[in-house]
Each structure stands twice: as structure tokens, then as C-alpha cells.
Amino acid sequence: MAYQSRNNVTNYGYFRNWMFMLQRVTGVITFIFITWHVFETRVQVALGNVEHTDLGVLMHDLVQNPWVLAAYIVGLIAASFHFANGLWAFLVSWGITVGPRSQKVSTVVCMGLFVVMSVMFVLAITSFANPEFAQLPEGV
């Protein structure tokens, strides 16, 4: 879908056209990000390269690299936007928000959800840089 749809934001720079284009872009970014994240964490545990209890230390080590941290932040924000905008599209396509006023209200609510989720995810990923995650606590 991301590659088949025809974006026309240069001809018609309407808000919803931009949201349509960003939904496709963030979908691709989110797919790449989730694939990479699952490979770095769950697949490594399944292969026996990392113990499940060491995932906090692994994440600490990953976010010490500023490029990796930036990639995580971009991926998390893209996933948050993709979810929130997809929720808006779901509400419209299922006939829950039919009129212009209800669509405007749902736009504000969904974009508010995007901001809240993005802030929470960025705070969560940056917390792994805390030295407390550098090693496992005693007795674990």
C-alpha cells in the first residue's frame, strides 16, 4: 500500500493529504524499526546470545551509541504517529466519526494521543541510558 498509493501533497497541500502521506512513510519506518528491534532483542534471546534477564543491560549498551538512540527515537515517534493516525482513519472508515466536527475532534484527540505516547516512549528509551542499567542487580 505504501508503494502503490499516489501522494499528491505537492498539488493539494491539504492537512489530510499530508496525514495520508505521513501514514505511509511512518508505516515503512515502523516496519523497519520493529524488525530491527525484535532482531536485537527477542531473536538474540532465542539464539542464546543474550539471557532474558540481561535485556536491560543490552538496551543500556545499545543506547550508549548516539546513532542507535536517535534511530530508536525516530522509530518510536514513527510508530506512535502511525498508531494515532491509523486510529483516526479507523474511526472515520468505520463510521464512528462521520461529520466534519466529529472528525476535527477525533483529530485533536488522536494527535494528543500521539504526543503523549511519543513523550512516554522517548522518556522510556532514554531511561535505559541511566547507569543503573549498566549491570544486573545483585542476586539476579
Can you annotate each of these PLM segments?
Residues 1-140:
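Membrane-embedded alpha-helical bundles that constitute the cytochrome b-like, heme-associated redox core
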